[in-house]
């Protein structure tokens, strides 16, 4: 770094470049209850000291820039700057560190995930002094979280709305995801709901394509819901995807869903954006609609271990932005998800108060105060043989979603739904009787096949289907 040079134009201002660590590395700093805290996994470029790199992260994500500027003297940097207050090496990794940064609350606009992310995960991720940077966790203080509405309704209100308690909810994504006409799509929805599932779902890329315009799909799905409700006596729903190219069009679709009297709509919150998602969440709360969230594009952001944003941060952001359900991985299916890491962010979605637990990747204690919780949705390559593990892993406050695991049944859609409902009821009963689903799960399913031919057929079809690959996202 070049030395500072005294200028003639002003007293006290020194033009030039100085090390970030002289201003932004503060190991003696005691964090405040109102600070937003961040834990970054940082890999500096060769020859860059970790203190300088960590300070650069704090600077470039708060008040700093590459050189001293005149206007530094017009504000209080000590009040507004981010501070790198701790650095710890990552065990077993060379030249990799966990860097802790504290941000003053006044740096962020109230109720705006968009602004929060623009600062903390903005330009700093392209900084040349860093080989890689990943945001592992955020501590959101109550002083900030209380500026957000959060989920439109939350877990307890949803259960009261649909009058279903004491078990996970069951869903199904309609397949094939693209190409069906609206009428055939609605027929599949009806058959699955009639068979015993609670919800069906638009796939994330079903919006309003030439083969099925959104208004037609909404109409046929609403008809299917009402018909299935009349036959079963249960409240049913279909996640009608309101995601659109503009916020205005998205809200128009949500309004039409409300006019049809359906209980729930859906949004792709990462591709749609946080501003759109928060707008839709506010609309859903005001108009009594539940909001299902799909996380399409998340793996682009969170799958690389050394660079990006961990999903636990995206999950916290969604809870603040607003959603009643969000996809969270399965642990046992075809999609990425290590058990303890997954359970860590599932707790961050559902619980009011979550203790720091590094064994599950939770770097900070998080207190959500009174913000409603979000139901985690397990989906992706799951079938009836997974039901015991899913029930044991996710518990009652979850949605277990079987797409191919319902519609791939050899006897048809409704028998596929019957098989999943019977398997779930058997697992819940066994658990309530004190049986260990982790050890006895397969026996529970086999016993249930004796009085459910639909389940027996499903078990035969998927008895050898496994997705056994190494998990990338490990601690």
UniProtKB/Swiss-Prot annotation:
Modified sites of kind N6,N6,N6-trimethyllysine: 14
Q: Identify the InterPro entries for this entry.
A: RuBisCO, RuBisCo_large_chain_AS, RuBisCO_lsu_C, RuBisCO_lsu_C_sf, RuBisCO_lsu_fd_N, RuBisCO_lsu_N_sf, RuBisCO_lsuI
Please state what class of enzyme this protein is: lyase
Q: Where is this site: Transition state stabilizer?
A: 334
Is ATP-binding one of the keywords?
Answer: no
Q: Which family does it belong to?
A: Belongs to the RuBisCO large chain family. Type I subfamily.
- Which CDD domains is this protein grouped with? RuBisCO_large_I
Which keywords describe this protein according to UniProt?
Acetylation, Calvin cycle, Carbon dioxide fixation, Chloroplast, Disulfide bond, Lyase, Magnesium, Metal-binding, Methylation, Monooxygenase, Oxidoreductase, Photorespiration, Photosynthesis, Plastid
Query: Could you say which residues bind substrate here?
Result: 123, 173, 177, 295, 327, 379
Q: Which residues carry this modification: N6-carboxylysine?
A: 201
* Subunit structure and binding partners: Heterohexadecamer of 8 large chains and 8 small chains; disulfide-linked. The disulfide link is formed within the large subunit homodimers.
Q: Which protein is depicted?
A: Ribulose bisphosphate carboxylase large chain
Question: Where is Mg(2+) bound in this sequence?
Answer: 201, 203-204
- Cofactor(s) named in the record: Mg(2+)
PTM N-acetylproline: at which residues?
A: 3
């Amino acid at each position: 770094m070049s030395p500072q040079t005294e200028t003639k134009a002003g007293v006290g201002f020194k033009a030039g470049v100085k090390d970030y660590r002289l201003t932004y590395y503060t190991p003696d700093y005691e964090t405040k209850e109102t600070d937003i805290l961040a834990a970054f996994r940082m890999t500096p470029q060769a020859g860059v000291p970790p203190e300088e790199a960590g300070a650069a992260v704090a600077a470039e994500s708060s008040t700093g820039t590459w050189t001293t500027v005149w206007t530094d003297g017009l504000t209080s940097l000590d009040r507004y700057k981010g501070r790198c207050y701790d650095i710890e090496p990552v065990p077993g990794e060379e030249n990799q560190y966990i860097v802790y940064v504290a941000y003053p609350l006044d740096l962020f606009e109230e109720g705006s995930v968009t602004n929060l992310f623009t600062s903390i995960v903005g330009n700093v991720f392209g900084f040349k002094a860093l080989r890689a940077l990943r945001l592992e966790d955020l501590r959101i203080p109550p002083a900030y979280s209380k500026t957000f509405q959060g989920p439109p309704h939350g877990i307890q209100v949803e259960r009261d709305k649909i009058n279903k308690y004491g078990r996970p909810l069951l869903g199904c994504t309609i397949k094939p995801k693209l190409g069906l006409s609206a009428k055939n799509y609605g027929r599949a929805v009806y058959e699955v709901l009639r068979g015993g599932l609670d919800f069906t779902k638009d796939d994330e890329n079903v919006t309003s394509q030439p083969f099925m315009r959104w208004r037609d799909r909404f109409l046929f799905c609403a008809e299917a819901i009402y018909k299935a409700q009349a036959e079963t006596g249960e409240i049913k729903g279909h996640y009608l995807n309101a995601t659109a190219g503009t916020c205005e069009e998205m809200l128009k679709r949500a309004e039409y869903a409300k006019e049809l009297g359906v209980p729930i709509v859906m949004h792709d919150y990462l591709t749609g954006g946080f501003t759109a998602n928060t707008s839709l969440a506010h609309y859903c709360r005001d108009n009594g609609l539940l909001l299902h969230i799909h996380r399409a594009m998340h793996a682009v952001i969170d799958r690389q271990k050394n660079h990006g944003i961990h999903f636990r941060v995206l999950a916290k952001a969604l809870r603040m932005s607003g959603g009643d359900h969000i996809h969270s991985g399965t642990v046992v299916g075809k999609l990425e998800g290590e058990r303890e890491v997954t359970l860590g962010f599932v707790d961050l979605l559902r619980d009011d108060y979550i203790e720091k637990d590094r064994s599950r990747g939770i770097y900070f204690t998080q207190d959500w105060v009174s913000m409603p919780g979000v139901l985690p949705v397990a989906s992706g390559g799951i079938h009836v043989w997974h039901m015991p593990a899913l029930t044991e892993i996710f518990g009652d406050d979850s949605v277990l979603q079987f797409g191919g695991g319902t519609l791939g049944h050899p006897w048809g859609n409704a028998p596929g739904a019957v098989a999943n409902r019977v398997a779930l009821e058997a697992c819940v009963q066994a658990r309530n009787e004190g049986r260990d689903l982790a050890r006895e799960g397969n026996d529970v399913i086999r016993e249930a096949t004796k009085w459910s031919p639909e389940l027996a057929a499903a078990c035969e079809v998927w008895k050898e289907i496994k997705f056994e690959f190494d998990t990338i996202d490990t601690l």
